Amino acid sequence: MIDTHDITGLILAGGRGSRMGGVDKGLQNFRGLPLALHTLMRLQPQVGDVMINANRNLAAYESFGVPVWPDGLADYAGPLAGFLTGLERCETPWLLTVPCDTPLFPPDLAARLAQAAMREGADIAMAAAPEADERDGTVRVRTQPVFCLLRVTLLESLVRFTQGGGRKIDRWTEQHACAVVPFDQPGDDPHAFYNANTLAELHALEGLGLR
């Protein structure tokens, strides 16, 4: 069993926000709070500690009361750069990554990923959720690679991968024992993994999960 206090949560807020017009996603308003602060409040009960990966407006993120770390890799290198920063700074055996733009993620995310990691003896546990195919509307369960529980012993592997130019999460995770955890059970929120790439999508999310 993985104890809650053996997991550090990492909020990924280091992106460019290009599809939001270049704004800092994590600081956009969601139900009266900055999006990253809402994410922090949802994540904190699930883990022992939380930190934020951000690359601008660091003082604003620091005001949330948790450590804030920028990417070590240059030029907004993507989520794996955040993974790398988190693994470098993590002081617990496990790191749980959560993006700042998916505010309805499950309240039992950490517990279910941890159970799967232990059950399968995996180094990584990754969430999966139903998604409609844009072409034909068919609903399939797809992995959500930014929602990952990682052993901190994977740091050396990720350093090698990124130094070799690797930037895609799935290309790295497929090198390791990875448990995939589908969040498609009765009672699971079908909107839990909806993310906001635009301000319109963010406003639409505000009305979900309240009914």
UniProtKB/Swiss-Prot annotation:
Name the CDD domains for this protein.
MobA
Q: Could you tell me the EC number(s) of this protein?
A: 2.7.7.77
Organismal lineage: Bacteria, Pseudomonadati, Pseudomonadota, Betaproteobacteria, Burkholderiales
Gene behind this protein: mobA
- Binding residues for Mg(2+): 101
Subunit structure, as described in the record: Monomer.
Of which family is this protein a member?
Answer: Belongs to the MobA family.
Q: What is this protein called?
A: Molybdenum cofactor guanylyltransferase
Q: Which GO terms describe its biological process?
A: bis(molybdopterin guanine dinucleotide)molybdenum biosynthetic process
Record comment regarding domains: The N-terminal domain determines nucleotide recognition and specific binding, while the C-terminal domain determines the specific binding to the target protein.
Organism this protein belongs to? Acidovorax sp. (strain JS42)
Please list the cofactors this protein needs: Mg(2+)
Keywords tagged on the record: Cytoplasm, GTP-binding, Magnesium, Metal-binding, Molybdenum cofactor biosynthesis, Nucleotide-binding, Transferase
Subcellular location per UniProt equals:
Cytoplasm
Q: Which Pfam families match?
A: NTP_transf_3 (PF12804)
Purpose: Transfers a GMP moiety from GTP to Mo-molybdopterin (Mo-MPT) cofactor (Moco or molybdenum cofactor) to form Mo-molybdopterin guanine dinucleotide (Mo-MGD) cofactor.
Highest taxon of the lineage: Bacteria
Molecular function (GO) terms listed?
Answer: GTP binding; metal ion binding; molybdenum cofactor guanylyltransferase activity
List GO terms (cellular component aspect).
Answer: cytoplasm
Q: Where does GTP bind?
A: 12-14, 25, 53, 71, 101
Question: What does it catalyze?
Answer: Mo-molybdopterin + GTP + H(+) = Mo-molybdopterin guanine dinucleotide + diphosphate
